């Protein structure tokens, strides 16, 4: 639209200059007239093109080209490997709701489990952004590497860092606000009608023995998350306030793949469910599970 207006303006100026004549041209008219002296584009006759087509069916009777087969062979092998079953999924997984649903629980649990293997000690909490889960569901049955690649297409890496109890509560409030997935906490939240967003009401962690513990604002807690959230800044700048940031040299995708393979090797099927790690607070009413949240 900008260029159309500019052309219309130039044409109007040129027409005005032609009317008033060369003797009375203003500098603008003279410039416009000079600019208008552009060689005209000569029309070109359309070329005559003759096309001849024939149908040639290609089926099993046509031998494969060895040179083409040699090029695609490595890729075919990789695709076959990606589609091969690496575990058995019970119940299926679905994304949605607070915490990314059962799919979010599955990924967060997997990251926490593999982080414990790398660190060789219990991990209190793992948090990831549910928006990074790019597959809405995985059906019950065989689960393959390609399912995990589709679910986690990004190269987000696991990191561990230390937060004070006060910083951790702020981070978990963001976790609720953004409906992110987590493993290790029991969270109660509510809707702030004035701000039109979810907010943290109460949270408890589990110690190495499985007992629930309150967050001490003055204590230090080691958590696992992903580099994307640490680098993001903005609301997540609380993570940049943490200490002893350490990369685990493991991507989210590889962590989940390793988790599935390890569970399968141990004879355990892959499963995750809505287990009440997020509970909605209805004020005077009893707290309800995430299946019943609005």
Report the location of each language-model feature:
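Disulfide-bonded cysteine motifs in exported proteins
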Residues: 12, 24, 70, 288-292
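N-terminal secretory signal peptides that target proteins for export/translocation
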Residues: 1-6
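Feature targets compositionally biased, intrinsically disordered low-complexity regions
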Residues: 20, 86, 90-91, 98, ...
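Acidic/histidine-rich, surface-exposed loop or edge segments in extracytoplasmic proteins
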Residues: 80-98, 236-242
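Feature captures C-terminal
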Residues: 32-60, 101, 105-294
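N-terminal, Lys/Arg- and Ser/Thr-rich interaction peptides
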Residues: 62-90
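Signal peptide processing junction and immediate N-terminal pro/mature segment
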Residues: 21-35
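Bacterial N-terminal signal peptides
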Residues: 10-22
């Amino acid at each position: 639209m900008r260029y159309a207006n500019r052309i219309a303006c130039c044409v109007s100026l040129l027409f005005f200059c032609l009317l008033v004549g060369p003797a009375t041209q203003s500098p603008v008219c003279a410039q416009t007239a000079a600019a208008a002296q552009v060689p005209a584009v000569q029309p070109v006759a359309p070329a005559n093109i003759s096309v001849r087509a024939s149908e040639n069916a290609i089926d099993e009777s046509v031998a494969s080209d060895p040179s083409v087969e040699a090029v695609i062979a490595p890729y075919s092998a990789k695709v076959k490997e990606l589609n091969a079953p690496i575990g058995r999924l019970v119940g299926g997984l679905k994304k949605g709701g607070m915490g990314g649903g059962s799919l979010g629980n599955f990924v967060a649990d997997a990251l926490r489990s593999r982080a414990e293997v790398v660190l060789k000690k219990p991990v209190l909490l793992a948090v990831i952004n549910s928006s990074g889960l790019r597959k809405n569901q995985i059906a019950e049955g065989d689960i393959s590497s390609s399912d995990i690649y589709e679910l986690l297409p990004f190269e987000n890496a696991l990191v561990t860092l230390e937060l004070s109890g006060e910083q951790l509560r702020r981070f978990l409030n963001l976790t609720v606000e953004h409906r992110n997935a987590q493993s290790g906490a029991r969270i109660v939240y509510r809707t702030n009608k004035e701000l039109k967003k979810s907010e943290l009401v109460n949270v408890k962690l589990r110690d190495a023995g499985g007992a629930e513990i309150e967050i001490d604002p003055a204590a230090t807690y080691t958590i696992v998350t992903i580099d994307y959230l640490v680098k993001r800044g903005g609301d997540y700048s609380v993570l940049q306030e943490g200490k002893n940031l350490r990369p685990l040299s493991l991507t989210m995708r590889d962590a989940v793949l390793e988790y599935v393979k390890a569970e399968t090797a141990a004879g355990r099927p892959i499963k995750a469910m809505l287990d009440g790690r997020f509970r909605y607070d209805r004020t005077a009413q009893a707290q309800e599970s995430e299946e019943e949240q609005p």
